[in-house]
A protein has these predicted regions:
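Receiver (REC) domain active-site loop signature in two-component systems and cognate sites
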Residues: 61
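Acidic catalytic/metal-coordinating carboxylates
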Residues: 38-41, 65-68
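A Lys-centered signature of the CheY-like receiver
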Residues: 108
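Active-site beta3 strand of CheY-like receiver
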Residues: 50-56
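Alpha4 helix (beta4-alpha4-beta5 surface) of REC/receiver domains from two-component response regulators
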Residues: 68, 89-104, 117
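Receiver (REC) domain switch/active-site region of two-component response regulators
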Residues: 111, 120
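Two-component/phosphorelay signaling modules centered on CheY-like receiver
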Residues: 12-34
Length: 127
């Protein structure tokens, strides 16, 4: 089964940045990535895809934040790990994300080496 990663972020450059950093993996079919530019769009994608392997979500988005989205994702897909990716790396935000069910927490600017290790670990667990 192919690893499917959903990236949720309202910033317009996120998709191109992720596709650039993971271009070899994507070309090799190691995993697939889809992108949602809002929490409601992500929730729709979670409903449509029967088995996302990993969700990476920004926290600060207009309308519905990643923290507001997190319990809804966990209710629909309790076994899918969600890693929060945010510019707000303070302890209160980290604690709130963990309490809501986040499997991990990364701060922006994104350390793509660290993110790759997170993805590799998740892929090993599901293999």
């Amino acid at each position: 089964m192919s690893t499917y990663i959903l990236v949720v972020d309202d910033e317009s450059d996120v998709e191109s940045m992720f596709r650039q950093h993971f271009r070899r993996d994507l070309r090799a079919g190691r995993f697939t990535m889809e992108f949602a530019n809002s929490a409601p769009a992500a929730l729709e994608q979670v409903k449509r895809n029967p088995d996302p392997s990993l969700i990476l979500s920004d926290i600060n988005m207009p309308g519905m934040s990643g923290l507001e989205m997190l319990p809804r994702v966990k209710a629909a897909r309790p076994n899918v790990p969600v890693i929060m990716v945010t510019a707000y790396g303070d302890e209160a935000t980290r604690k709130k994300a963990t309490e809501l069910g986040a499997a991990g927490f990364l701060t922006k600017p994104i350390d793509f080496g660290l993110l790759r290790r997170e993805i590799d670990q998740r892929m090993e667990r599901t293999a």
